[in-house]
Amino acid sequence: MHYSPKKDGARSHGLPYDPFKSSAVPRPIGWISTVSADGKHNLAPYSQYQNLTWDPPMVMFVANQSVLDNGKSRKDTVRNIEETGWFVWNMATYDLREAVNRSAKALPYGEDEFEFAGVTKASCLEAPGARVAESPINFEIEFVQSLHIPTGNPVSTFDLIIGRVAHVHIKDEFILDDGKIDILSIKPLARLGYYDYTYVDKMLSLIHI
């Protein structure tokens, strides 16, 4: 099959679900925690998250407009980041899958997703918000830039957030004797298309020729 999102629109594939989302897989989950200037905590997963560079370590994620008002306002996460200059990435894992899923629910402004998801707040070294204590790895990230990108569709306009990693927290029990992270024990969760997810339970190594 072939379809042209540029010519005929993103939904011109004629399938019941979007094949694009199921082709760009697996995607790391941006489980992002923030706090507002007046101290209201927020936690939400974003399925379009990725690292940009490793030296200095920088990351990015995309947030669509809020679904609570038909896409007319920006997400609480984005507003909090621009207000405080910080956000935290928390590694989503298989064991935390239910908490990740619960934190995806769009709650009214000011309701605490940490409490709703049933996870614990841990203090940060520099970021004003909290990190997920149960997560094996957390990044404290300093806000660098946001790009508000129009798409021509009023309900799919999005914000691209770029940040620089200032602090990395790793639970000691997940560092192997050879200094590598024990990924197979962590079982990182990743996003697929539809309502599907996967997690890392197999690895292979390829030496560059």
Task: Write out the residue ranges for each language-model feature.
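Basic, polyanion-binding surface patches
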Residues: 1-207
